[in-house]
């Protein structure tokens, strides 16, 4: 367990720590530091194993969860709202309606309509040409730079549209009984997480697969196999809180318990508390100058969790149709 002593979090690990290499100990201690410090690599901790103090085993580690902050945007009553500052600010006006999900940044983004078609979204909120070569999609999310990723309506293919260059990717190891549903890209853009549903003849759950990129950073394909990180079924939303912490939740259904989970991937799952009204979408972005978990409920209220992921929920916006999917 973790104990607090003189404002320093202390823990004692098993003798297995002593059998690790210096590099392995460094990664483990850095992951512990990032996890306990809510992504801060400067958090002071004390890590002991027997009589050995490994508190500084990660001094040479470059692993860092301080990823660039992407401002969180919402779609609210025809307006695109930035939550970057402590007060919601309108940054664009739009005629978007019947929106399933959208992606937005200072350079624009994309919008997925309930009809399944994706249109490019300019920075002023106006919509333009169809994306993904006119293919219908079930979900979209943001990638590196101008990349927009998505899952087609068949649930069998992952697609990426990078400024009009479209690539369709098969997922190695996906069998006929399995389909893809929600998805999210890691902050560095080299991993995709996605939920898998099965008709009963195969495994459901949450998986992560690597993205292969060319020397110029463009997408070349997917790695040879995906790693199943959870066997939780019915997962409809997910987000990378940082490089190492991943969150997901099951589909919201009125009157039924909703399950939220988080884990340091790959690693064991722990429960993630959700607001009392549940969640219909989640994302991670800059709110009030800090990187925060953001959740939208079925009443259109956006809440963020303060401090650690176990902190209290605070209302950030209301009358919201959709969160910008980071």
Positions of PLM-derived features:
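Bimodal "functional hotspot" detector
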Residues: 1-326
